[in-house]
């Protein structure tokens, strides 16, 4: 029986940032963590997020866009908000749930280079967490 911790990445629409974070999380943390993502709303996975991750050989076509699940939120070991809106309106978490904010620009509707930059920034941040625990 696995006894993995759970990390829950949250953003507004579970469309871009949290989808990319889930993918990077599975790559860098998947051996020790259950990696999940959700949004305040579910906007569907942005095709450019799929394309951006494909560029780094990570396939997210099977990931789904989901709204925040209260049960997962209450049982997560770590909740990471990726945008100010999610940080501001995220439901309260119990005291035992560690919550941190790692803010990233919203690439939706932006130039392709913004998707690539945000993808790389999220990947680097999660890799740092995997290596240092911070």
From Swiss-Prot:
InterPro entries registered for this protein in UniProt: Arsenate_reductase_ArsC (IPR014064), Ptyr_pPase (IPR023485), Ptyr_pPase_sf (IPR036196)
Residues the record marks as active site: 11 (nucleophile), 83 (nucleophile), 90 (nucleophile)
E.C. code: 1.20.4.4
Pfam families: LMWPc
SMART domains referenced in this protein's UniProt entry, alphabetically: LMWPc
Disulfide bridge map: 11-83, 83-90
Biological processes per GO annotation: response to arsenic-containing substance
CDD domains, sorted: LMWP_ArsC
SUPFAM superfamilies according to UniProt: Phosphotyrosine protein phosphatases I
Enzyme category, top tier: oxidoreductase
Subcellular localization, as worded in the UniProt entry: Cytoplasm
Keywords, comma-separated and alphabetical: Arsenical resistance, Cytoplasm, Disulfide bond, Oxidoreductase, Plasmid, Redox-active center
Record's catalysed reaction(s): arsenate + [thioredoxin]-dithiol + H(+) = arsenite + [thioredoxin]-disulfide + H2O
Keyword match Oxidoreductase: yes
Entry GO MF terms: arsenate reductase (thioredoxin) activity; protein tyrosine phosphatase activity
GO cellular component: cytoplasm
HAMAP family named among the record's database cross-references: Arsenate_reduct
NCBIfam families reported in the protein's UniProt record: arsC_pI258_fam, PRK13530.1
Stated family: Belongs to the low molecular weight phosphotyrosine protein phosphatase family. Thioredoxin-coupled ArsC subfamily.
Name of the featured protein: Arsenate reductase 1
Species this chain originates from: Bacillus cereus (strain ATCC 10987 / NRS 248)
């Amino acid at each position: 029986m696995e006894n993995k911790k759970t990390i829950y990445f949250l953003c507004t629409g579970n469309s871009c940032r949290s989808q990319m974070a889930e993918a990077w999380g599975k790559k860098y943390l998947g051996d020790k963590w259950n990696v999940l993502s959700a949004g305040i709303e579910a906007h569907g996975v942005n095709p450019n997020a799929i394309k951006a991750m494909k560029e780094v050989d990570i396939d997210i076509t099977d990931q789904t866009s989901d709204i925040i699940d209260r049960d997962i939120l209450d049982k997560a070991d770590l909740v990471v908000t990726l945008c100010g809106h999610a940080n501001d309106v995220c439901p309260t978490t119990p005291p035992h749930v560690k919550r941190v904010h790692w803010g990233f620009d919203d690439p939706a509707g932006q130039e392709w280079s913004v998707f690539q930059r945000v993808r790389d920034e999220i990947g680097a941040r999660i890799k740092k967490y995997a290596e240092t625990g911070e």
